[in-house]
Swiss-Prot record:
GO terms for molecular function: DNA binding; protein heterodimerization activity; structural constituent of chromatin. It comes from Chironomus thummi thummi. Monoubiquitination of Lys-119 gives a specific tag for epigenetic transcriptional repression. Phosphorylation on Ser-2 is enhanced during mitosis. Phosphorylation on Ser-2 directly represses transcription. This is Histone H2A, orphon. There is a cross-link at residue 119 (Glycyl lysine isopeptide (Lys-Gly) (interchain with G-Cter in ubiquitin)).
Amino acid sequence: MSGRGKGGKVKAKAKSRSSRAGLQFPVGRIHRLLRKGHYAERIGAGAPVYLAAVMEYLGAEILELAGNAARDNKKTRIIPRHLQLAIRNDEELNKLLSGVTIAQGGVLPNIQAVLLPKKTESKKA
């Protein structure tokens, strides 16, 4: 007697939905939060996977651009200023996050063309 009951089948090791989808973001937690938030009466099985994938992609995109901005400023640590520069210099991210204010982010350096000094032509005799 093996003590496993009738079937004798060994239960497979539990595998998270995040690892099945190849994601780092927690699919189970996102599913729970979608249910708890009362966004809809029912939540499909694919919805939290898709949402986790989108969130992971956006996070990776912003972090990559912010890392580039930090490296351009000769820094090894990403600060809110680098996030601001990364988002505002990217056309699509800027449009997506147009209504977002980043604390301690500052503004993009920009001088209007009319305020710049006029270029005078030097007269050569």
